[in-house]
Amino acid sequence: MDRRIFGLENEYGVTCTFRGQRRLSPDEVARYLFRRVVSWGRSSNVFLRNGARLYLDVGSHPEYATPECDNVTELVTHDKAGERILEGLLVDAERRLHEEGIAGDVYLFKNNTDSAGNSYGCHENYLVARHGEFSRLADILIPFLVTRQLLCGAGKVLQTPRGAVYCVSQRAEHIWEGVSSATTRSRPIINTRDEPHADAERYRRLHVIVGDSNMSETTMLLKVGATDLVLRMIEAGTVMRDLTLENPIRAIREVSHDITGRRKVRLASGREASALEVQREYYEKAVDFVERRGIRTGTVEQVLELWGRTLDAIEAEDLDRIGTEIDWVMKYKLIERYRAKHNMTMSHPRVAQIDLAYHDIHRRRGLYYLLERKGQATRICNDLKIFEGKSVPPQTTRARLRGDFIRRAQEQRRDFTVDWVHLKLNDQAQRTVLCKDPFRSVDDRVEKLIAGM
């Protein structure tokens, strides 16, 4: 599939610190956060003018699902626009708390674990063709996804009985199955719940829930871009070496606990391979595939260059070569500089604070944004485009139809209901349009519905 629909869903961690007054529960903090949303949307589960969905997920986690995008750079821009929308809600919630005499600071973290050991996710969505064996797709993808954390982990200081260790991935400790239909209880690598949000005879939605949430724009580009290339190879029938893992769940933890990428994991064939070797296999296949197909576009070029350079840098133990582009490396360097300056062990509480503060989405507080201001975080997005993305949907996918419908209905003060595939005016006629094709950004039926308001 040379043109694919992508979507990202990020759940955010919420906390609030209070200066000497009563503490609010996470539920109460979430209510303050969503008060503005509920006041106009009459719900804490809404679709926005940019085509995205914003809602309060299980356990008081705000979740932002990007609109459908058909290119990876636009997807990253819309994910960042979601961050900005939530940052706006955070500032508004703090103001309301202060007006009510509660001196508190609200924090939203784009990470995947809290101090109590709970995990919340970043879910990636890839539209794939319905024909073809899903089990073959999963078999080839799982070794790639287990070792992909070397490219796009967010990094974590893990407290163990033997002291704290720095790991590549936050999510790795919380994955318990390879393929399953659950998302919370057993947490698989690939979720098989079949909700394509599209024509079910033609498409299915690959739902990957193993990845970390990313602060870095370049890490996000690499995560989704490399996965897209692997999917394209599978769809084209590219012959791949059998890299099936003997125990993917053990392997994912082993890979996460080794920042050198050299630790061997057992394959089902009885052989052993390191995460670097597994990734190198997929990378070299991808380079060959792109050359043969003549699809070296700007984005594909960017993805392949960073993918190869990341593997080279880890192999050479020269992390400075990717020190402004890969989340886990950026955070690791930040922590190591701080530890060296203050002569601290990895177990020191200040180190845990840095680990968390990297993911603070408040641009004046968060450590990722401090790096960005200092020119130590490479960017691919444009701030103006991110700002536009808060209210303007992608123009080449179904998100445009949804966004335009919502905008018009709100301007005309009409009551409406939408989801990923339905647009409905709640009037006497109950007019509804079903939009099954996520690639379609122009539709006469929707234009008629909008014109009739």
From Swiss-Prot:
Highest taxon of the lineage: Bacteria
Entry keyword set: ATP-binding, Ligase, Magnesium, Metal-binding, Nucleotide-binding, Ubl conjugation pathway
Active site per database record: 57 (proton acceptor)
EC numbers on record: 6.3.1.19
Stored InterPro entries: Pup_ligase, Pup_ligase/deamidase
The protein's role, per its UniProt record: Catalyzes the covalent attachment of the prokaryotic ubiquitin-like protein modifier Pup to the proteasomal substrate proteins, thereby targeting them for proteasomal degradation. This tagging system is termed pupylation. The ligation reaction involves the side-chain carboxylate of the C-terminal glutamate of Pup and the side-chain amino group of a substrate lysine.
Protein's recorded name: Pup--protein ligase
Organism: Streptomyces scabiei (strain 87.22)
This protein's encoding gene: pafA
